[in-house]
Amino acid sequence: MSTSGPITEFPAPGLRDPFRYITGHDAEGNAVFVQTDNGDHRAVMLGGAAAQNIIYSAGSNPIELTGNVDLEFAKNRPSLHIPNGVCVRMIDFAPGCKSNMHRALCMGIGTVCEGEVELTLGSGEKRILRPGDVSINRGAMHQWRNTSDEKPARMLYTLLDIKPLIVNGKQLDFDMGYLMKEYAEYDEGEGDKKAE
């Protein structure tokens, strides 16, 4: 990990605090906004290299909306990804921030909202993503880097659970490296791939 300056809260300096608008239905069945706020479970990550904001989470897929079951689930801080569920996580990266190479065993759909981010795969292949660009990560080892040494970058990730991933007859392992320090309290961080 490298960074030219710590982030002390979400949002990162220079980025706006996003609103989320959650819809639902009133007692008569009319479509209404049931919640308007700035997200839940904000946290500074990795000593200020990044900060996250949980935009939405649900403990099932298909998602149970009846009786606001999903909104009740979302009151608790979710893990990195949710078995049989979904997590939508916004991450601000400090200028120059570079993650370690890692793999979360989930479908990670990442959209660049602000700045420019380099995505490097375990093979060494690289792509530069700009605002509006989307990465569909299907369990690949990868690394993120904010290409600017002056401005923060922001990405929005939708993380969906997957079935065990078999490549060349071998089941791939969860491997977050030092990023697991942010998620070590969760079962998926147990074992030899837990933070060192």
Curated annotation (Swiss-Prot):
Expression induction: Expression is up-regulated during sexual development. Expression is also up-regulated during confrontation with the arthropod fungivore Drosophila melanogaster.
Gene3D superfamilies named among the record's database cross-references: Jelly Rolls
Membrane spanning stretches: none
Domain Cupin type-2: 92-156
EC number assigned by the record: 1.-.-.-
The UniProt record lists the keyword Oxidoreductase: yes
Top-rank taxon, per record: Eukaryota
Annotated GO MF terms: oxidoreductase activity
A Pfam match: Cupin_2
Enzyme class per UniProt: oxidoreductase
Record carries keyword Thylakoid: no
Record's keyword terms, sorted: Oxidoreductase
InterPro entries, per the entry: Cupin_2, OryJ/VirC-like, RmlC-like_jellyroll, RmlC_Cupin_sf
Role, per record: Cupin-domain-containing oxidoreductase; part of the gene cluster that mediates the biosynthesis of sordarial, a salicylic aldehyde structurally related to the phytotoxin pyriculol. The most interesting aspect of this pathway is formation of an aromatic product from the highly reducing polyketide synthase srdA. SrdA synthesizes a reduced polyketide chain from one molecule of acetyl-CoA and five molecules of malonyl-CoA. The polyketide chain is then reductively released as an aldehyde.
Family, as annotated: Belongs to the virC family.
Name of protein: Cupin-domain-containing oxidoreductase srdB
Organism for this UniProt entry: Neurospora crassa (strain ATCC 24698 / 74-OR23-1A / CBS 708.71 / DSM 1257 / FGSC 987)
